[in-house]
Amino acid sequence: MTWLGESTPVEAVIFDWGGTLTPWHDVDYAEESRALAAAVVGEGPGDAPQVLLEAATAVWTRSRDEHVSATLADIFTHAGLTHDEDLLHAYRDFWEPHTLTDPDVLPLLSRLKVDGVRVGVLSNTVWPRAWHEEFFMRDGVLELLDGAVYTSEVPGTKPAPQAFEAAMDAVGVTDPAACVFVGDRLFDDIWGATNVGMRTVLVPHSDIPAWQVGHSLGEPDAVVERLAHVYDVVASWRAA
């Protein structure tokens, strides 16, 4: 694929999180909903785990189709349930084993930083920033990030242009042609980033559920089988 910004130097590489920096895991969503239900306080309509499962599906479907962001609180609201944030520890404990950073990430980001490339993250998420930062800190990655955007804090989700523009702002780059976006999803990541003028790298690690696949498929500028190979792709573009 020919990239229209070939003469523009690469200044930043922005990564998707789930399925890219963190390997994709198939999880039991019914079990996830039971863990989430542990934060419910008071009475609510019907069986709380089932209602929360349906609410989460609706929230993520809206994110996919309308590119509207959401938070964990929005899932409870959609379910008609009240929750206590201090009781979310069971839900977080459920997810923690699935948040481990890919072993390639630390050396990859370190090499990019040595080369003077800015590094960022753009993640479609309902989780608070603090959770993501704690996971990155646990794995020794947080200090390597120049900026990060978590869509739980902004109005739109990938592939909306505003999400990518916010990520550019976070890493201090104004020209999308100077950015490379790395992700595992052809719609949210590749199509969305290409649409704003970024160069793209697909890391096809994820077996994405059909209900999460968007209506459009993007064409990446490069495809790599592991994150470590992203460095060579970026280096070749910087040398061109």
Task: List PLM regions with ranges.
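Asp-based, Mg2+/Mn2+-dependent phosphohydrolase catalytic module
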Residues: 1-15, 27, 42-47, 106, ...
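N-terminal helical cap/lid subdomain that shapes the substrate entry/recognition surface
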Residues: 2-115, 128-130
